[in-house]
A protein has these predicted regions:
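Non-heme Fe(II)/2-oxoglutarate
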Residues: 1-74
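A short glycine-rich, His/Asp/Glu-containing loop-to-beta-strand
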Residues: 68-89
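A short beta-loop-beta micro-motif enriched in histidine and acidic residues
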Residues: 76-77, 90-106
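Short, conserved beta-strand element in jelly-roll/cupin
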Residues: 84-86, 99-116
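A short hydrophobic beta-strand segment most commonly corresponding to one strand
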Residues: 104-111, 133-135, 149-167
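A short beta-strand-loop-beta hairpin characteristic of the jelly-roll/cupin
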Residues: 110-129
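Conserved metal-binding segment of the jelly-roll/cupin
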Residues: 126-142
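Asparagine-centered strand-capping/turn motif at beta-strand->loop junctions
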Residues: 144-148
């Protein structure tokens, strides 16, 4: 992998997927539009270290976070959000930061990403394995395609320090 790499975090199960989808469909107004793109929404679970009470409705995410803090290099969480891309939609070509040669600090964990991919300019398409975590070089122009009839759901975690991003 060149612009995207899997990192050794515990696998996150799909036990909360239906709850996440229900929360999204019933609580749509609680989700923020990301970068002015109508098909891409997010909900902050942890923001500036403050945890939303909604986290208690997602026990597999809670267990995963506890395991990560206990058994991995991920410690303090600065930001954690659910990211949802509508079925048969895309996040157009964009960059998230200026530096193109380093991995971003944020960790993307796939919850439901079947029949979707991230593609980087002058590179290939990367397909996330559900339950696994990845780092991307978000300074490289990229897009996300959801070819599925289902919501594409990921968890984006930004720790205060991410040693996985420093490893080549």
């Amino acid at each position: 992998l060149i612009n995207c790499k899997q990192i050794p975090l515990p696998k996150l199960g799909k036990e909360d997927l239906q709850k996440i989808i229900s929360f999204f469909t019933m609580g749509h107004h609680l989700f923020d539009e990301r970068y002015g793109h109508h098909a891409w929404k997010s909900f902050d679970i942890v923001k500036e270290g403050n945890t939303s009470p909604m986290i208690k409705h997602f026990p597999s995410i809670v267990r995963w976070l506890i395991t990560c803090r206990k058994h991995t290099a991920v410690r303090d969480i600065e930001h954690l959000y659910l990211s949802i891309l509508m079925p048969r939609n895309q996040i157009p070509w964009h960059v998230d930061m200026q530096q193109t040669d380093i991995y971003a600090n944020s960790i993307i964990t796939s919850i439901s990403t079947a029949n979707s991919f991230i593609e980087f300019e002058n590179d290939k398409q990367y397909h996330y394995r559900e339950g696994y975590s990845y780092l991307i070089k978000s300074g490289v122009k990229h897009r996300i395609m959801n070819l599925s009839d289902e919501y594409r759901v990921t968890l984006c975690l930004t720790p205060k320090e991410n040693p996985y991003a420093d490893m080549a």
